[in-house]
Regions:
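Core catalytic lobe of class I
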Residues: 2-12, 17, 27, 31-32, ...
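Intrinsic disorder/low-complexity segments
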Residues: 23-24, 37, 43, 69
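S-adenosyl-L-methionine
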Residues: 114-133, 371-399
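Catalytic-site neighborhood detector that most strongly recognizes the C-terminal catalytic loop/helix
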Residues: 355, 367-370
Length: 411
């Protein structure tokens, strides 16, 4: 039986630009910055159990925590460490950065494997290897898991090249942790797992060993490097699976897309499946399994970090809104820079994430602090998703909705 719900959402703003040339230049600058960057990691252990809040511009600890982990051992050897360098950034660059004082303060908000053994709690960022701590997380605890594992690709890391595994080896690697993650999901829970064209078939085979695959979402990245002897890779897949196909939550009404209608169709002079407004004609459309409205974070967006494979908040917002309800628990065993945790917090869900790289955990912690003051999600406003380059339409829509609510309250 499907559970349905309706929720109102706070005002948000969209960070997309309508000028393609500016967006292209932004992407080029970010790529240049990333190519010059050496990733960093810290040392030391956090105390765990901290709430992500900001008070009087200072980070305070009030009782929660959260993180994520797991790394493919063959591709990233343990003896390779990450380092950071200071960058000169443009004045409008909003990429998340850390001062030394922030590193020290945020580090106290991050849990580790030892603090997890002392007791699990919701809203933790755990700086640890997933395989070393996953058994300390309770079974059947999470309503939804979002997984963005290492893809089976050739990589250059700190100047060293690592080769991809065979499909059989990669599937063995997936089984090594996927079965354990499945145990953490409730009997009526759901899962989304990301992959690219090369590893998506392996992911499907392993997922189907434990869960029922319901669909495959393909989303378009406007980024991607060109290739001389192959097609440019600008698409990624997200597999949607559930434990029980007869009992899971999916709320399509929470992920509707508002699109402008360029050629409206009328029946006897009345709008057909669209709304006529002073600002134009719009239609509420059901989401398909192909998404071309997602912007990959770049330097002028508040959510942007230096993580090389950061997922957009808008992308995860669709997954979380469709397959969970406020108060539900979200697990991300490969947290990265914290997108799943941040979006879960903005949408009033609990989270737990594991990440092996301390630098990424610190970025996630800062983003969680910022989410207290800014709950906006690019491309999502007042319970509605918007297509690319529709910032003006979205702002008008939100403003009129707000004015309408004020009039009703005054009556």
């Amino acid at each position: 039986m499907h559970r349905k719900h309706q929720s109102g959402w706070r005002k948000s703003r969209e960070c997309e630009t309508s000028e393609q040339s500016e967006a292209a230049e932004q992407r080029r600058e970010q790529n240049r910055e990333r190519s010059r960057t050496e990733r960093g990691s810290g040392t030391g252990k956090g105390s765990g159990g901290s709430t992500w809040t900001r008070k009087n511009k200072e980070i305070t600890k009030t009782g929660l925590g959260r993180s994520r982990a797991g790394q493919r051992p063959r591709l990233i050897p343990n003896n390779i460490t990450m380092t950071t360098t200071n960058k000169n950034r443009a004045g409008r660059n909003r990429t998340v950065t850390l001062t030394e004082q922030e590193r020290e303060t945020l580090g106290r908000l991050i849990s580790d494997a030892d603090s997890l053994k002392a007791g699990f709690r919701d809203d933790m960022v755990i700086n640890a290897d997933m395989m070393e701590c996953i058994d300390d997380i309770p079974d059947a605890h999470f309503d939804l898991a979002i997984i963005d594992p290492p893809y089976n690709t050739d990589k250059v890391f700190n100047g060293t090249r690592f080769g991809a595994m065979s499909s059989a080896e990669y599937e063995d690697y997936l089984r090594g942790w996927f079965y354990k993650v499945c145990d953490k999901i409730k009997p009526d829970g759901s899962l989304y797992i990301c992959g690219d064209w090369k590893c998506t078939a392996s992911i499907q085979r392993v997922v189907e060993e434990k869960m029922t695959v319901m669909n495959r979402i393909s989303w378009q990245r406007e980024k991607g490097r060109g290739a001389k002897r192959n097609w440019k890779n600008s698409m990624e897949d997200i597999w949607f699976a559930v434990k029980n196909p007869n009992d899971y939550h999916f709320d399509v009404s929470a992920v509707m897309m508002r699109r402008r209608v360029n050629a409206p169709y009328r029946v006897e002079g009345m709008p057909k499946d669209w709304e006529e407004t002073d600002d134009g004609n719009f239609r509420m459309t059901h989401p398909s399994n192909f998404w071309d409205d997602i912007s990959v974070p770049f330097w002028s967006m508040h959510e942007n970090t230096d993580h090389p494979t950061q997922k957009p908040e808008k992308l995860y917002a669709k997954l979380i809104l469709a397959s969970s309800m406020p108060g539900d628990r979200i697990l991300d065993p490969f947290l990265g820079s914290g997108t799943a945790a941040v979006v879960a917090k903005k949408l009033d869900r609990h989270f737990c994430g594991i990440e092996i790289e301390r630098e990424y955990c610190l970025w996630a912690a800062k983003r969680l602090i910022n989410a207290d003051e800014d709950k906006t999600i690019q491309g999502y406003a007042d319970g509605v998703f918007w297509e690319r380059n529709s910032l003006r339409d979205m702002n008008k829509f939100v403003r009129k909705k707000k004015q309408g609510r004020k009039r009703k309250q005054a009556e």
